[in-house]
Amino acid sequence: MASFIDPNQLDLEDQVVSINRVTKVVKGGRRLRFAAIAIVGDKNGHVGFATGKAQEVPEAIRKAVDAAKKSLIEVPIVGTTIPHEVIGHFGAGEVLLKPAEEGSGVAAGGAIRSVMELAGIADITSKSLGRNTPINMIRATMDGLTQLRTREQVAELRGVSASSLED
């Protein structure tokens, strides 16, 4: 399990990915609520996401941002991209994340693009496979990002020196 990342030490930006109106039918009619999905990141290798639900949109957004700050993860970045190719899974959604050459930009759509930009990854290629609802794409992307390892981390896990690893 990763250690806790203190959001107060970071200069975080937030972005609302989606706001969904949810109704519950009760005896007296319909009850309206709102669900918001927010992503926070410092554009320097830290990113988190969460959902917030409330009777008013601003309150749902505030709850989502506050919860996202508590779920930050650290993303290993090599130059301007990720260290290696990875596939993240969540539910019926899959996301393929591939490193890209410097200057190629973020080739990702929708919610995946927001995660990458707030994580500070400038060059990456991605492909969404399976279902593409925003929350499942974000969760699959975060799953993929948590699987990333740097060359030094892999060498330490294998018990060898980083220079002995092949490219």
UniProtKB/Swiss-Prot annotation:
Disulfide bond annotation, renumbered to this chain: none
Free-text comment on this protein's domains from its UniProt entry: The N-terminal domain interacts with the head of the 30S subunit; the C-terminal domain interacts with the body and contacts protein S4. The interaction surface between S4 and S5 is involved in control of translational fidelity.
Name of the protein in its database record: Small ribosomal subunit protein uS5
Family: Belongs to the universal ribosomal protein uS5 family.
Pfam family, one: Ribosomal_S5_C
Domain S5 DRBM residue range list: 12-75
Subunit structure: Part of the 30S ribosomal subunit. Contacts proteins S4 and S8.
GO molecular function: rRNA binding; structural constituent of ribosome
GO CC, one annotated term: small ribosomal subunit
PROSITE patterns in the record: RIBOSOMAL_S5, S5_DSRBD
Described purpose of this protein according to its UniProt entry: With S4 and S12 plays an important role in translational accuracy. Located at the back of the 30S subunit body where it stabilizes the conformation of the head with respect to the body.
Keywords from the UniProt entry: Ribonucleoprotein, Ribosomal protein, RNA-binding, rRNA-binding
InterPro entries linked: Ribosomal_Su5_D2-typ_SF (IPR020568), Ribosomal_uS5 (IPR000851), Ribosomal_uS5_bac-type (IPR005712), Ribosomal_uS5_C (IPR005324), Ribosomal_uS5_N (IPR013810), Ribosomal_uS5_N_CS (IPR018192), Ribsml_uS5_D2-typ_fold_subgr (IPR014721)
Keyword Cell division belongs to the record: no
PANTHER family the UniProt entry points to: MITOCHONDRIAL RIBOSOMAL PROTEIN S5
An individual GO BP term: translation
